[in-house]
Amino acid sequence: MSRGPRNVQATDRAIASALGRMSVLVLLYHGVRPDDAQPATTNLQAKHVSQSAFAAQMDWLIGAGYRFIDGDELRWMSKARSLPRGPAVAITFDDGYANNHSCALPVLRPREIPALVFLVGAFVDRGEPLWVDRLEQAVMSARVPELTVDLNGARRTLTLAGAPARKAAESSVRSYCKRLPATARESVLQELFAGLDAPSSPLPALYRPLRWDEIDDLRHAGWTIGSHTMTHTILAGLTAAQARREVGEAKALLEARLGDQCDLFAYPNGLRGDFTEETQRVLAGLGKTCALASVEGRVTRRFEPLAMRRVAVHDRMGLAEFKVRTTGAVGVAKSVKAGLRTAQSALRRRRAG
């Protein structure tokens, strides 16, 4: 006999309660899109979830007994090095897409759910499209069958024959460009754009940044505003001075425009290797009290305030997978695999020596 909805919800609440005694869940979103079909050339990385899926996820969290925490509680966690009463969850958005206001807010406001959004300074202030979105759109709308470009010091020819090949080409260029400082990255992109012969049309509305009046509306709805650097450049590849400028300029911009201290931060990309101890010293020197990474997992009792884990949510994730990921099991599995690889490498080195 299958379990009824009440029994399922009771189980969900029991699991959430048990996890909440020793950890906090921080969810990472980028955008929320309308439910109507999107063009095949957009949302390749599935970082904009459908509005109906987002609503279902929020309703499941409510039904499982989660308490939604805001920026003030994250600050308290960082300063006290302690966890709030659980089960607790924070809803976070990176980059600053306009659909955070047009699609996410209508889901969160009636449910009285607070959120945090981490803004890329140049994106929201100057309306400069994020380079990853410019790349995605240019590759997917290119009018040439292939492209030769310098990647990692070598000339590579990328085929663009069909959607799968275009997605693979976009992924290769994106992975390479992520490791470059902003100026070098822009040089690579300009060479690539010149050879793609893509239409010079505006980017789809999905990629539009928040306006300042929309940001103010989010604040009035209980959202906390944090920074995500000035140009979305991975900090580990920068000198301390460059990192200080990337973080400091965005912090100064947001504080000047919003009139509040901007002490919360999210790392661009945010995976292991994308930030270092030196990066964390730069953040601390600029008054950052809490920094969120993209390393998968829940925030446990021994967390680092300047490297708090999150669980990323994407558009291809069904509710069943969402439930599993909220437990942090995927992050644990990844950590175990990484540990095994490290141990195996060490063993091979000892044998070779």
Locations of the language-model features?
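C-terminal active-site subregion of NodB/CE4 polysaccharide deacetylases
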Residues: S2-T92, N99, L130-L151, R155-L158, ...
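Glycine-rich, histidine-containing beta strand-loop boundary motifs that form or position
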Residues: D72, L119-G121
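CE4/NodB-like, metal-dependent polysaccharide N-deacetylase domain
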Residues: L27, W60, P84-R85, Y97, ...
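Short, acidic loop-to-helix structural element flanking the phosphoryl-transfer center
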Residues: L206-D216
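Short beta-alpha junction loops
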Residues: G121-V124, G297
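Short, flexible loop segments at the rims of nucleotide/cofactor-binding pockets, characterized by
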Residues: F93, S201-A205
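Conserved phosphoryl-transfer catalytic core
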Residues: G127, W131-P199
